[in-house]
Design a protein with these regions (language model features):
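Alpha-solenoid helical-repeat scaffolds
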Residues: 1, 6-7, 11, 29-32
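Parallel beta-helix/beta-solenoid
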Residues: 3, 12-15, 19-20, 25, ...
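Sequence signature of WD/YWTD-type beta-propeller architectures
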Residues: 8, 18, 30, 50, ...
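Extracellular beta-strand/beta-solenoid scaffold signature
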Residues: 10-17, 37-47, 61-67, 83-90, ...
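Flexible loop residues that form catalytic
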Residues: 20, 33, 116, 200, ...
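Functionally critical loop-and-helix segments that line ligand-binding/catalytic clefts
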Residues: 130-136, 167-171, 175-293
Length: 293
């Protein structure tokens, strides 16, 4: 079946699919002017379905732009989800899915992927998701997945990871975010490789003392090391977790000291002799130049 090239204005729910398979939702424009989450619905709402393709749609001004629950082997491609009250895209209990080439901009809390596995996230843009409880991408209890070639720009928190394991973060760009990556509890065996971290207030915030996540060959705009043999790799490891990010996690009011000379001295002392931050959370091969892919 196909739901194609429709315009739906001032709707509560836009398109609702239940117990469906082998369908295409394409080229639709769905808009509303939702004022509160309790009085609004979702643009594209899919429940207990499989092999659904949602592509080239615009969903603006609803509660969730696209919502999937118990939806497997499906694709979310080249959609624009903007100005939605809660999430631009909301995954729950959905496995073996791809979302690629989407733009998620100025949504209440960005994108949430929860209680899922084998999710492929490629070439998406997460932009301008600002707020005290906002982020570009929330990962909660998601395993065995990959994020590649995504851009995170101007978000309060670009990625918030909680109880996520065996995730590969490859060749993504984190630009001008409050936090680039905020790692909560029970986050293990993740691999961060060849990403660009550009001018974020905090590149990595980490709440625990134990770490077995790997950072390698990333570019960090805050790296001040040297490359004597000119192989493009810094000769001194980079520690992305600062003491100040640890203090802000413990005492949020400390954020008023951001970029003060006193904080710079604290961060330097923690790099020399780590006490509060994980000593083994380092990038041993930081890149000297921004990575192109």
């Amino acid at each position: 079946f196909e739901v194609r090239n429709n315009r739906l204005d001032q709707v509560f729910f836009g398109i609702l699919l239940e117990r469906s398979s082998e369908g295409i939702v394409s080229g639709n424009i769905i808009t509303s002017k939702a004022k509160s989450q309790s009085t609004s619905g979702n643009g594209v709402h899919i429940w207990k379905s499989e092999e659904i393709t949602v592509k080239n749609n615009e969903v603006i001004g609803l509660r969730d732009g696209i919502y999937l629950e118990f939806v497997n082997n499906s694709e979310i491609i080249n959609n624009l989800c903007k100005d939605n009250l809660r999430y631009g895209l909301h995954f729950m209990f959905s496995d073996h899915d791809l979302y690629k080439g989407n733009i998620f901009e100025n949504n209440g809390a960005g994108v949430a992927v929860m209680y899922s596995k084998f999710i492929d996230m490629q070439d998406n843009q997460f932009r301008k998701n600002w707020g005290s409880a906002s982020y570009g991408l929330l990962l909660k209890e998601i395993n065995d997945s990959e994020l590649k070639n995504n851009i995170f720009e101007d978000n309060t928190i670009a990625i918030s990871a909680d109880n996520t394991n065996r995730i590969d973060y490859i060749e993504n760009e984190f630009r001008n975010n409050g936090y680039a990556i905020r790692i909560r509890g029970a986050v293990y065996d993740n691999n961060f490789k060849r990403n660009n971290f550009l001018y974020n207030s905090f590149d990595v915030a980490y709440t625990g003392r134990l770490n077995n996540n790997k950072f390698s060959n990333n570019y960090w705009s805050g790296y001040s090391g040297y490359d004597l043999n000119r192989d493009g790799i810094g000769d001194v490891p980079f520690r992305p977790v600062t003491l100040f990010s640890y203090l802000v996690n413990k005492t949020p009011e400390a954020i008023v000291l951001l970029r003060s000379t006193f904080i710079d001295l604290l961060d330097f002392s923690e790099k020399v002799s780590p006490i509060f931050t994980p000593a083994d959370l380092i990038d041993a091969q930081p890149q000297m130049k921004k990575i192109q892919w």
